[in-house]
UniProtKB/Swiss-Prot annotation:
Species name: Danio rerio (Zebrafish)
Keywords, ordered alphabetically: Cytoplasm, Nucleus, RNA-binding
Key word Magnesium present: no
UniProt subcellular location: Cytoplasm; Nucleus; Cytoplasm, P-body
Protein name: Shiftless antiviral inhibitor of ribosomal frameshifting protein homolog
Task of the protein: Inhibits programmed -1 ribosomal frameshifting (-1PRF) of a variety of mRNAs from viruses and cellular genes. Interacts with the -1PRF signal of target mRNA and translating ribosomes and causes premature translation termination at the frameshifting site. May exhibit antiviral activity.
A Pfam family this chain is assigned to: UPF0515
Length: 327
């Protein structure tokens, strides 16, 4: 395994461990534990949630192990820089308005005897007894990071994408301009839609938008979509195309159905291209950071741009570029 790939894998495990405890675990400690237990964030998270014993910080042996581990040091420096940058941004906005782990970093006996895990369990267990904290421990023990899939769209770069993000941190960064965005509002989403006709009970899929009606392929009734579906890579597989050509009541639809609705726009890529309109139908709101969250496992931080795919593939990001443009 190359040193760069090793750093990526270590970073992913550290981000996952910290996300399970909402960023309450220090970066140094998280990196040390992931090196010690071969990036097994599931096991470590479970033991932290179960532990309640003494209280201590990193001892000299642990600190020496990190100092002699270049991979761990690089990950620590990167994550700390991200955290510091986030804190500086928050403070500014408020004021204005290949080496492996060293021998000492290897696992010490069992997790139940690990002082670092014990210390974390003790410190986290004295948190106030709230529903949110209880939910955090329950989810950590069950190896869960609650997440949802959302559509994002960058107006300045004219691109849209789908991403699975934590429920507590619904934000995604555009890979081109690096700006952070909130999800497209649910009532403004567009793309491959799923329809259920209340008149003929027909179920079908086609391009649509949540705030616009499309004709049923069966009875031609004008109906709203039930939901917008994330594109699937399997749509790129060769095979017969759908029998029904796209058609809607939008004024500028390339295959318009009458009576059309004046002033409405078609979201089908053919119509957008024919009418020389931007790809993005409704842009994401710009994300305003509260400074209350950290860059964790499902955030868009990466070692370098070319390494992004390793992390994105791991969390199954799906881009509209991967979808079939026909309906």
């Amino acid at each position: 395994m190359s040193r760069m790939h090793e750093e990526v894998e270590l970073e992913k495990s550290v981000r996952r461990l910290r996300e399970k405890f909402h960023g309450l675990i220090e970066i140094d400690t998280a990196v040390l534990l992931m090196r010690r237990y071969v990036k097994n964030h599931r096991m470590v998270a479970m033991w932290i949630a179960l532990m309640a014993d003494n209280d201590r910080e990193l001892d000299e042996e642990d600190q020496a192990a990190l100092n002699n581990d270049p991979v761990a040091k690089n990950v620590i420096m990167k994550l700390k820089a991200e955290e510091q940058q986030q804190e500086e941004k928050h403070a500014k906005s408020s004021s204005s308005g290949s080496s492996g782990a060293g021998p000492s970093a290897k696992a010490k006996k069992q997790p139940s005897d690990d002082r670092d895990i014990t210390e974390l369990g003790t410190r986290l267990r004295v948190l106030p007894l709230t529903m949110e904290n209880k939910r955090m421990f329950d989810q950590a023990q069950a190896n869960q990071i609650p997440s949802d899939t959302h559509q994002f769209a960058c107006e300045s770069c004219d691109r849209d994408w789908w991403r699975r993000v934590p429920q507590r941190k619904r934000v995604s960064r555009c890979h081109r301009c690096k700006k952070k965005n909130d999800p497209v509002p649910p009532d403004r989403m567009w793309g491959i839609a799923e329809f259920t006709c209340p008149n003929c009970t027909r179920n079908f899929k086609g391009f649509g938008r949540m705030d616009g009606r499309s004709p049923c392929y069966g009875c031609r009734s004008a109906i709203y979509p039930m939901k917008i579906l994330p594109p699937r890579r399997k749509n790129m597989m060769p095979g017969p195309k759908q029998r029904n050509q796209h058609s809607c009541f939008a004024e500028d639809c390339y295959h318009r159905m009458e009576p059309h609705v004046p002033g409405t726009e078609c979201v089908h890529p053919h119509s957008r291209q024919k009418n020389r309109k931007p790809r993005v139908v409704y842009p994401s709101p710009a994300h305003i950071s509260s400074g209350s969250t950290v860059n964790t496992c499902l955030s868009q931080g990466s070692l370098i741009e070319s390494i992004n795919e390793l992390i994105l593939d791991d969390i199954e990001e799906e881009s509209e570029d991967d979808s079939d443009s026909s309906s």
